[in-house]
Amino acid sequence: MTVKDFIDKLLGRQTSSASTAKQRLQLVLAHDRSDLNPELLAQMRREILEVVARYVEIDIEEGDVSLETEDRMTALVANLPIRRSIQQSPNGGTL
């Protein structure tokens, strides 16, 4: 998600159909270039959420893990709203 997309979403602006089509095409290209099948991407998402949830309380429903392509480079992007930090004890357990 670009900064412009974030601001548009924050302000409740609708995206144009051309913009939506472009985002979908970029997603298809990112999946194709990364050679990750949807099942593997879903497994990665679950595991990433599990690891992050050990340290902070996250909003899983609002979170997003996706592939994004920009300038011929594909990145795995995790956008995870954090509710609060989880206190860790000195021995590694939660308090």
From Swiss-Prot:
The keyword Signal does not apply. Gene3D superfamilies: Cell division topological specificity factor MinE. Keywords: Cell cycle, Cell division. It comes from the Bacteria. One of its GO terms (biological process) is cell division. Belongs to the MinE family. Prevents the cell division inhibition by proteins MinC and MinD at internal division sites while permitting inhibition at polar sites. This ensures cell division at the proper site by restricting the formation of a division septum at the midpoint of the long axis of the cell. This is Cell division topological specificity factor.
